[in-house]
Amino acid sequence: MMDGFAQDWPTLTHTDNGLAMDQLGGDLPLDVGFEPQTRARSNTWPCPRPENFVEPTDELDSTKASNQQLAPGDSQQAIQNANAAKKNSSRRNAWGNLSYADLITHAIGSATDKRLTLSQIYEWMVQNVPYFKDKGDSNSSAGWKNSIRHNLSLHNRFMRVQNEGTGKSSWWMLNPEAKPGKSVRRRAASMETSRYEKRRGRAKKRVEALRQAGVVGLNDATPSPSSSVSEGLDHFPESPLHSGGGFQLSPDFRQRASSNASSCGRLSPIRAQDLEPDWGFPVDYQNTTMTQAHAQALDELTGTMADELTLCPQQQGFSAASGLPSQPPPPPYQPPQHQQAQQQQQQSPYALNGPAPGYNTLQPQSQCLLHRSLNCSCMHNARDGLSPNSVTTTMSPAYPNSEPSSDSLNTYSNVVLDGPADTAALMVQQQQQQQQMSASLEGQCLEVLNNEAQPIDEFNLENFPVGNLECNVEELLQQEMSYGGLLDINIPLATVNTNLVNSSSGPLSISNISNLSNLSNISNISNISSNSGSSLSLNQLQAQLQQQQQQQAQQQQAQQQQQAHQQHQQQLLLNNNNNSSSSLELATQTASANLNARVQYSQPSVVTSPPSWVH
């Protein structure tokens, strides 16, 4: 096989002066085309091929070594195709065009029983391949033997079979189920990209179809040359969120000027259409005409908005006895006709032909002139009487509390009223009446403010009508305790016993307060509520009160026990003192008795005279 490389290789061309051709490049014309010069054989590896080299046919051809069985007619064509592929292949080893796997395949196939051990494969390489003849020793064979073992382990065409004998190496055989041609490595199965290439090809086709179909519509406005390729990226063809097809952006978004820097920022979030809706009104708001259907729709819309913005008296802390009765809702919408407006002006002196409803829907709520910073109830009643959406704002005497303040009526001063010129006098009269009504309304608001500003000290339970009064003490305590420790209860016991009546409804009536033992319990409740700072139920308060009473009883019992213990100790001390004194007295008496006995014993005997009868 290596005999074909023994031909003479072309040498470097020298000139007459001994210089190589590549050193004369500056002296030659520039239009002369230079062919690549071949280098010396010692300066390159693997060995370069000569220009007219024809690879000889040898028995080590990889087509013969493969385990694929070909028909006799097709074998010649397969060998020619393999040789043509080898000539164009980029793999060139020192021993030829065959790889290690091809050599191992030929070695196993040349055996009689189609199996070889690892040492036999080494031996076959040294004997049959000229390149390995002088590399059989242990020093120079480490590299290529490692490559042999590597290829045996990684290729699917080789199969390892356990040897029957003990202490013998395993057999290596050809796998009959292996695929022909280049075998796939076992550990490199992830590098098999055939499926990925197919999937990628289908994706490219889909992108091209999207470019042809959709990009034309997006690029109607003179696209730049740089946007021809990257325009299709805006469709997101392979996005996981749009697996059904390309995601095309909305036509409401217009494109900016194309840029070479990025294709992602070329879509502007500015809408192509105007943001303002087309109301169909001219710029001049003085002469405004509206249809009845449009006015009714606006009236319903703002009516629901006004209902949502209603301030409930319970939320703002209004009392029921504020002096202003609740007003019913205003009359329903009336069509804005000029004749009907004139009839209403003749019937009621408080009629005002207002502006078109489309431009009064955002007016602020009418509020008392002197109570802008206070929670006045006149604001709620004035809002109920005014309908800012109605074309004809009617202030009927049936709604005496529905007079708007002067600042809300000033909003109509810049609007030209519809009607003939003879209504000027009527307008002056209406303005005077409106001023009078606003003054009376201000007086009512002042009265309400004065009534609400009365001090709490003047509130007397004796004169208060409590015939059908029911009080939920639990809610009262929760509301009072929500002020964060500002509860102060001062209720005389006599007033509680005399003026509070029983009530059958509600979770707890006022009469249950009289069941408390004394004012100290009420003060305990106030102390508990002021310290807690949070809403507690009455049951919890009672439990805490009972707990405090139990603690007090336990403290009293402990004090009594301590006093008894002290008395007992004092009694014991007295007893000890008495015992010591008695023992001292006894010892003293005993000592004195002994002393007397000793004195009597020590005295001399007295000689008495014999009796008279003795002679």
From Swiss-Prot:
Biological processes per GO annotation: cell differentiation; glucose homeostasis; negative regulation of cell growth; negative regulation of cell population proliferation; negative regulation of insulin receptor signaling pathway; regulation of DNA-templated transcription; regulation of lipid metabolic process
A Pfam cross-reference name: Forkhead
Coiled-coil segments on the chain, per record: none
Polar residues bias (residue ranges): 63-77, 221-230, 256-265
UniProt-annotated location(s): Cytoplasm; Nucleus
Residues recorded with modification Phosphothreonine: 44
Gene Ontology cellular component annotations, sorted alphabetically: cytoplasm; nucleus
Phosphoserine: modified positions: 75, 190, 259, 262-263, 268
Region described as Disordered: 39-77, 182-205, 217-269, 318-359, 389-409
DNA-binding region(s), chain positions: 95-201
Top-level taxon of the source organism: Eukaryota
Biased composition annotated in UniProt, kind: Pro residues: 326-335
Assigned keywords, A-Z: Activator, Cell cycle, Cytoplasm, Developmental protein, Differentiation, DNA-binding, Growth regulation, Nucleus, Phosphoprotein, Transcription, Transcription regulation
SMART domains, alphabetized: FH (SM00339)
Biased composition (Low complexity): 336-351
Keyword flag Cytoplasm: yes
InterPro entries per record: Fork_head_dom, TF_fork_head_CS_2, WH-like_DNA-bd_sf, WH_DNA-bd_sf
Residues spanning the membrane: none
Keyword Phosphoprotein recorded: yes
GO MF, one annotated term: DNA-binding transcription factor activity
Functional summary from the UniProt entry: Transcription factor involved in the regulation of the insulin signaling pathway. Consistently activates both the downstream target Thor\d4EBP and the feedback control target InR. Involved in negative regulation of the cell cycle, modulating cell growth and proliferation. In response to cellular stresses, such as nutrient deprivation or increased levels of reactive oxygen species, foxo is activated and inhibits growth through the action of target genes such as Thor.
Subunit structure: Interacts with melt.
Protein name per UniProt: Forkhead box protein O
Organism, as annotated: Drosophila erecta (Fruit fly)
UniProt lineage: Eukaryota, Metazoa, Ecdysozoa, Arthropoda, Hexapoda
Gene: foxo
